């Protein structure tokens, strides 16, 4: 879909459809009031007859309104005016896109970006409208033989901004929104791909394609099992040794900083393309969803795509830690003791706590880049789902300023995170009689002890950990990858690049 911004009066629009808001109870927004005045009270008369209350989710399509040049006016319920927050705003945009597609309108001028949203400026409203529109229109039908296509899909959306001074900000919002939405789509496509197709080799092929697309400043290197053995990445290798698919670590290097020697931001993504649990096998119920255990790697891939598309003036390294945890005669066992790349030893008490074993060696590997910061993203623990549910990502960090940056980016983007503690009391739960540490610390504080485990491999740099086990995908009828936290990390990078236009 094509997006653009303009600043104009509603009565002068000749678009196929004009979109304006209505508040509860039956109150016209300022733009709707202008159209009502021109139409000699036609719209307000409809509201008085009870055609539309103005609740969020309601809509009413009007045809050939008197004295209006546009063929149609779409009235969208926005709820109570004083309660219009960012969550309701996104719901309103989502309803708008669905309603426009149902009407068969191929283009529309949307005045909803002029609504007052608490604490949000025009840039935010336009960018979120773009991201939400793309999210609403997303489908994953690559593997279906019969694809459902709309008769006349919406092709062009124009967002109106209050003044001409805001056109530049609106244009930048569209540019950023499209890049972030493309990153989210890329992450969702990877996450939704079945594990018989999307294995570590597939992740590597996608990483190589990304480098080919943005070859001016992006390269990809793929590290296989032989090189991992030479590096001493025994924990990473142990997880994958029960699989017939080779473990591959894909390293995407993007150099956009005018000074290529500036220390990079490193993003590490857990890429378990399928997690059976290994010898500590998972229950059969919903095991199919363990294809989503690579959503951390998918997130990193999507964020790297966004950064390259916007040519951000940063040096960024994205690592996709691809692997598969399967049951086999060669699989690693509970009771095994592994020597990690760092030299620390780990007693395996549960083979289903495998993500941290892949990550610990990857986090040691990235020391060679002398990073400014390292952020890992992983569907790491069911305990984080219990703690924070499916709406908020868990955040842990060994560096307060980095944690605050990420929390700020989460608020700005609406891709929420919440910080959990990393304290010595939790470290004690990882003690082992036979190795430097165990790979699990018991049920209490399971998300935190997983973070504590990783923290033992990140002492040489500033580090943060995002546990996305609850936010990376949805179950049930709407099953599918969410693309989170691409938006959060994209905002973090935009802030780092000095391109923070969000209030």
Curated annotation (Swiss-Prot):
Pfam families linked to this entry: Peptidase_M17, Peptidase_M17_N
Tell me where it mainly resides.
cytoplasm
Alphabetically sorted, this entry's keywords are: Aminopeptidase, Cytoplasm, Hydrolase, Manganese, Metal-binding, Protease
Its GO CC terms are: cytoplasm
Tell me how the cofactor is bound. Answer: Binds 2 manganese ions per subunit.
Q: Where in the cell is it found?
A: Cytoplasm
Q: Which residues bind Mn(2+) 2 per the record?
A: 270, 275, 293, 354
Q: Which domain of life is it from?
A: Bacteria
Please state which protein family the record places this protein in: Belongs to the peptidase M17 family.
| NCBIfam families from the UniProt entry | PRK00913.1-1, PRK00913.1-4
In Swiss-Prot or TrEMBL terms, this protein is called Probable cytosol aminopeptidase
State the species of origin: Pectobacterium atrosepticum (strain SCRI 1043 / ATCC BAA-672)
Upper taxonomic lineage? Bacteria, Pseudomonadati, Pseudomonadota, Gammaproteobacteria, Enterobacterales
Name of the gene this protein is made from: pepA
């Amino acid at each position: 879909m094509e997006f653009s911004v303009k600043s104009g009066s509603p009565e002068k629009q000749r678009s196929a459809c004009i979109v304006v808001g209505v508040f509860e109870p039956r109150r016209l927004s300022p733009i709707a009031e202008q159209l009502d005045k021109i139409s000699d009270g036609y719209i307000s008369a409809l509201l008085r007859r009870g055609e539309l209350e103005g609740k969020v989710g309601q809509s009413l399509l009007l045809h050939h309104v008197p004295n209006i040049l546009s063929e149609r006016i779409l009235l969208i319920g926005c709820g109570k005016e004083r309660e219009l927050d960012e969550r309701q705003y996104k719901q309103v945009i989502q309803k708008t896109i669905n309603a426009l597609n149902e009407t068969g309108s191929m283009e529309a001028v949307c005045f909803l970006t002029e609504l007052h949203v608490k604490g949000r400026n025009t840039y935010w409203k336009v960018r979120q409208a773009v991201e939400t529109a793309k999210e609403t229109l997303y489908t994953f039908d690559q593997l279906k033989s019969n694809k459902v296509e709309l008769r006349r899909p919406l092709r062009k959306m124009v967002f109106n901004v209050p003044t001409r001074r805001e056109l530049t900000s609106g244009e930048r919002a569209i540019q950023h929104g499209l890049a972030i939405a493309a990153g989210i789509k890329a992450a969702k496509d990877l996450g939704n791909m079945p594990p018989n197709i999307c294995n570590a080799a597939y992740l590597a092929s996608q990483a190589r394609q990304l480098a080919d697309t943005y070859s001016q400043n992006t390269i990809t290197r793929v590290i296989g099992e032989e090189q991992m053995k030479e590096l001493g990445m025994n924990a990473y290798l142990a997880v994958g040794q029960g699989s017939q698919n080779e473990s591959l670590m894909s390293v995407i290097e993007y150099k956009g900083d005018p000074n290529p020697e500036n220390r990079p931001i490193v993003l590490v993504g857990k890429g378990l393309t399928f997690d059976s649990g290994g010898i500590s096998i998972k229950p059969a119920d919903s095991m199919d969803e363990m294809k989503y255990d690579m959503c951390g790697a998918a997130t990193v891939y999507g964020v790297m795509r966004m950064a390259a598309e916007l040519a951000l003036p940063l040096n960024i390294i994205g690592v996709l830690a691809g692997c598969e945890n399967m049951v086999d005669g060669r699989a690693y066992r509970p009771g095994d003791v592994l020597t990690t790349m760092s030299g620390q030893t780990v007693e395996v008490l549960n083979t289903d706590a495998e993500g941290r074993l892949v990550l610990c060696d990857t986090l040691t590997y990235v020391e060679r880049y002398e990073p400014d910061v390292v952020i890992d993203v992983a569907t790491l623990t069911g305990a984080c789902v219990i703690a924070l549910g499916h709406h908020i990502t868990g955040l842990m960090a060994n560096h307060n300023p980095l944690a605050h940056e990420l929390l700020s980016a989460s608020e700005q983007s609406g891709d929420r995170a919440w910080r959990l503690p990393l304290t010595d009391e939790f470290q004690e739960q990882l003690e082992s009689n036979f190795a430097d540490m165990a790979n699990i610390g018991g049920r209490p504080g399971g998300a935190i002890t997983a973070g504590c485990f990783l923290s033992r491999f990140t002492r040489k740099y500033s580090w943060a950990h995002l546990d996305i086990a609850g936010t990376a995908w949805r179950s049930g009828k709407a099953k599918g990858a969410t693309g989170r936290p691409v938006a959060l990390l994209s905002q973090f990078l935009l802030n780092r690049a000095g391109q923070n236009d969000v209030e």
